Design a protein with these regions (language model features):
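Outer-membrane beta-barrel translocator domains and adjoining extracellular loop/strand segments
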Residues: 1-3, 42-49, 76-78, 92-102, ...
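Gram-negative/organellar outer-membrane beta-barrel architecture
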Residues: 1-64, 70, 146-155, 163-170, ...
Length: 251
């Protein structure tokens, strides 16, 4: 879009939240609150345009529901997971001049099942969408890369580099086979598929055949400081290969 294959981006996010949460039916975590966020996005390598893409304050109200019975965050062998959140953006200082109130809704679901000793299948699905006339591009869903803490609407996606795919709505599925061949040592094979774009639900494209796919072969080692992971991934759409190294817990 900007006539370059890649560029460096500085992303600064300062967030404060005030929220209340409780346990519902001894299984579900439910909560609601308010959020203040300041985001600044700039790039000194984007040619011919204003290097600052956003420098705004945002105020929002949100609610969420979570359920998590997985026995491990990084290498689960049994259990289920669900997370749903709705967030209404009500105010912005509007650096871009594009803001009007809008709402983001997103959800995740997953399960892990051990088929035999040391061998586990993991299934995950997630989706996100926006409602409103002018959704600020800052809050688009952005897919690509692996090994980072998935803050805001940045999501992992094997086979594509960081921030490669984006839009105001998406749906993604992941299947992974993990084999613990020695205590705390894992080999895994993963495949993910997604549709990403603008207004996918409104245009009926959400459940069409996936536009994007990627595959990854990985090794993981559980340490007291968090997992050590190496992932090599590839996408048949681009024929590009990426290797990522992740060390420690994600914060």
């Amino acid at each position: 879009m900007l006539g370059v294959e890649s560029m460096n981006v500085d992303f600064k996010d300062f967030t404060n939240q005030l929220f209340f949460q409780t346990v519902f039916a001894q299984r579900f975590l439910i909560g609601a609150g308010a959020e203040y966020k300041h985001i600044k996005i700039k790039s000194n390598t984007a040619p011919g345009i204003n290097p600052v893409f956003d420098d705004s304050d945002y105020a929002s109200a949100f609610g969420y529901l979570k359920f998590d019975s997985l026995d491990d965050k990084y290498f689960p062998t049994e259990g289920y997971y669900f997370s749903g959140e709705a967030k209404a953006f009500l105010y912005s200082s509007d650096y871009t001049g594009q803001f009007s109130p809008f709402t983001l809704v997103k959800g995740e679901i997953g399960t892990a099942k051990t088929l035999f000793k040391g061998f586990t299948l993991n299934f995950q699905g997630e989706t996100g969408m926006s409602f409103g006339e002018n959704v600020v591009p800052t809050f688009n869903f952005v897919l690509g890369g692996y090994g980072y803490y998935a803050t805001n609407n940045f999501r992992h996606f094997y086979g594509y580099d960081f921030m490669s795919l984006g839009g105001n709505s998406y749906i993604k599925g992941l299947i992974s086979a993990d084999y613990e061949f020695y205590r705390r040592h894992h080999l895994n094979l993963s495949a993910n598929y997604a549709n990403v774009g603008n207004n996918l639900y409104e245009e009926g494209k959400m459940l069409s055949l996936p536009q994007y796919s990627g595959y990854a072969l990985g090794y993981g080692f559980e340490t007291i400081l968090g997992p050590l992971e190496i992932k090599h991934s590839w996408s048949p759409e681009t024929n590009k290969h990426f290797t990522w190294v992740s060390v420690g817990f994600w914060f």
